[in-house]
Amino acid sequence: MASHSDTLVVFFGATAGANGGKLGSDERELILLVWQIVDLHENKVGKLHRTLVQPDSVDLSEQCKEETGLTAEELCKAEPLESVLQQFHQSVSAELKSLGRSSYTLCVDGPLLIRQVLHPEASKKNLVLPECFYTFVDLKKEFHKCCPNAGPVKDLTLLSMLDYVCIQATVEQEAGLREVKDMVLLILHVLADPYNHKFSAFETVNYKFESGACSKTEAVDSETVIRARGLPWQSSDQDIARFFKGLNIAKGGVALCLNAQGRRNGEALVRFINSEHRDMALDRHKHHMGSRYIEVYKATGEEFLKIAGGTSNEVAQFLSKENQMIIRMRGLPFTATPQDVLGFLGPECPVTDGTEGLLFVKYPDGRPTGDAFVLFACEEYAQNALKKHKQILGKRYIELFRSTAAEVQQVLNRYMSTPLISTLPPPPPPMVSVPVLATPPFITTGNTRDCIRLRGLPYTAAIEDILEFMGEHTIDIKPHGVHMVLNQQGRPSGDAFIQMKSADRAFMVAQKCHKKMMKDRYVEVFQCSTEEMSFVLMGGTLNRSGLSPPPCKLPCLSPPTYAAFPAAPAMLPTEAALYQPPLLATPRTPQAPTHSPAPAFAYYSPQLYMNMNMSYTTYYPSPPVSPSTVSYFAAPPGSVAAAVAAQPTPAILPPQPGALVRMQGLPYNAGVKDILSFFQGYQLQADSVLVLYNWSGQRSGEALVTFPSEKAARRAVAECSNIPLSGHPIHLACCE
C-alpha cells in the first residue's frame, strides 16, 4: 500500500447482531457490505455497491432486523464472506483502472468494522484478507482535525458530524446505502474550501504479533493493559494475538501467567499500543477461543511488569534475536550440557546460533533447575522439536512446550531471585524427635484479622480454583499466602487459609465471597487472624465451638505420647468472623487439656510442614525443588534452632518406642489398608502407617511404618522386602 492514496473507498458493514457503537461486541457475523469510490483529485464518486453476505448462522437479532430490514431468506441466497471479499477486490480494481488511478484506501466511520468485525471473523474462518484491509482512514478522526470543536472523537456520530457542518442527511430507505452516501457528502465537504483537507493519516492493522523482551524499568501505561482469563492451558502468545486480531498489541506485549508449579494458569496480561485499542479489547469480554469463552478485564502496568519485566543481561541478549520461535524444555538431567541438548534435538531442528540459542535456567548459586529455553529460526524447526515431547535424555523424559519472551523473563526472575523463606532446608534425622515452636515459623501470629478461611472446598479443588474463586481479590494475597489444609492422610480437608495484605481486604473478601459457588459446592468464607490460622495449621480445629488446641504429638510415627498444652487465650467462634469486633459478644475460654504433665513444647505434624511448603506466590513458576521431594520431617531446622534457644535447659524428650521402616516403590493408589494387608501377621494398627506425599499434594510412592519393636521391624524387612504389591516390587529399609 502506498504512503498516499489517489482514491478512497468508502466502506460500510452490518452484522447479524449489534451495530453502531456496539459493532462487533457480540461476535456476530457480517451480513451486509456497501462501498463507493471517491476520487480525491477530481472530487468525483463512483458506482454505489451493496452486497449481502451469507453468515454461518442466519439467526438475526431484533435490532438487526429493525435497522437493516433484512430477512433470513435473503441471506440464505447470498454468497459467503470469502466470495464477497473477492468480488469487492475485483470490482474496486476494475473501477480504479477505468478512472486511471493506481491506489486506494478504505475509509470507514470509526475503526470497529475493520478491527472488531472483519479481522476477527476472517481469522476464525481462516481467510487471508487482501492487503487493502490492513490500512484505512477513520473518517471521525479526519473530521476532528478539520473541526476540533465538534467534540471528542469517541462522541462523534455520522449525524452529529453532518449537523455540525449543516449538511442535510440523505433520505434513503435501504440500510447501508444512506450511511455510505452521508460519508461521501462529508468527504467532499472537507475536501473543498475552507478546509482543503488532505487524507494522509492512515490507521494500520498489524500483520502479526512481534515477541520481544521488556525491561522492569520500562514505563507501561495502565490504560493500555488488560487481563485475559480462561485461556486454554496450551495457548501460546500467538494464539492470544489471534484472539485479539485487528487490535495492535505492543511488541512483546503478551505475558502468560504461570502458577506455583510453573504451568500456565489460564491467564495472560496483554499490552496494547494505546488506550483506544485496550478499550476495544475490553469489548471482546466473553468472546470465544475455540469452544471456550475468554474473560477480559482491565489490568495495570505494574501487573504487566511483574510478569513480563526482566533485568538480566543474559536474558536480554538471549531475546535480542527477533522473529524467533521459543521452546521451553523441562525435566533436563542436572548434568545435561549444551551439547547434550543439541544432540537430543538433532539435525532436523537446528538451534539458532547453536549453543548461543540455549538458555539454561539456574538457581542463584549456579545449580541447574532442569529447565532450558531454546530458540528456533522458523515454525518448521519448532514443530520438529515439539515432536520430541516426552522423549528420553539420559534417564529422564523431557517435556517440550511453546514459550514466550515474557515466560522466559518470569521463570528467570523466579529462580534467580532470593526466596523470602528457605523452601527445603536440610532435614533432621527422621528417628530423632525435635522440639519446635508452638507456632509455624513462617507466620507471625497476632490478633489482626487479615486472614480468611475457606471452608467446604471441593476435595478436588486446587490452588488455581481458589484463585479463580477469589477473582479480582487475588492481587491482595500476600506472597506465600495460600495455605491448603490437608488431613493426616495428606488429602485435602476442604479447608484453606489465605493471608491478605490488610484486615480491610480480608473483610471485603469475606463479605463478597461468602457462600459463593465453587464447582457444585458453596464455600463459606470467614475473616480470621493469623493466630487462629496457626492453631488450625498445627492440627487444632476451628469450628462452631471455637478453637480447639492441636494434639501435641507426631502422628503415625510412634504410639500416642501427649504433651501438655498451655491454656489458650480467649477464642472466637467461627461465625464471629463475619462481623467487625464491636459487634462480638465476649468469647469464652476453652478448658486446658487434663493430660499428664510434660515439657511445655509441641510437635509439628507432617501435615503442617506440607501445608507450609505448598504456599503459593502469584504468577510464579515451579518451586525451586524437585517435584519428587518427599516432605515428611517434623520441622525445618530454623524452627528447631529457635526452640532450642528458647529453652533455659536442654529439653528432655519423651522416649519413642518402636522402630520405623521406610517403604519405597508403592503404587500411587496404594492406601493404608493396602499397606496393612502387605504386612499381614505383624499386628499393625492403621495409625502405625504414614503415607508420604510430594509437593504437589500427590502420593510419592513412599510410606513410613512404625513397628512395635526393632526386632519386628528387621524381621519385616528381611521377609517382605522386594515382595510385589499390585505388581510393584516394594523396597523396605529400617530407618536407623
From Swiss-Prot:
Major site of localization recorded for this protein: nucleus
Top-level division of the source organism's lineage: Eukaryota
Signal peptide extent: none
Keyword Chloroplast carried by entry: no
A single GO molecular function term of this UniProt record: mRNA binding
InterPro entries membership: ESRP, Nucleotide-bd_a/b_plait_sf, RBD_domain_sf, RNaseH-like_sf, RNaseH_sf, RRM_dom
Protein keywords: mRNA processing, mRNA splicing, Nucleus, Repeat, RNA-binding
Stored PROSITE patterns: RRM
GO cellular component: nucleoplasm; nucleus; ribonucleoprotein complex
Family annotation (PANTHER family): HETEROGENEOUS NUCLEAR RIBONUCLEOPROTEIN-RELATED
Function as written in the Swiss-Prot or TrEMBL entry: mRNA splicing factor that regulates the formation of epithelial cell-specific isoforms. Specifically regulates the expression of FGFR2-IIIb, an epithelial cell-specific isoform of fgfr2. Acts by directly binding specific sequences in mRNAs. Binds the GU-rich sequence motifs in the ISE/ISS-3, a cis-element regulatory region present in the mRNA of fgfr2.
Protein name: Epithelial splicing regulatory protein 2
Species of origin: Danio rerio
Recorded name of the encoding gene: esrp2
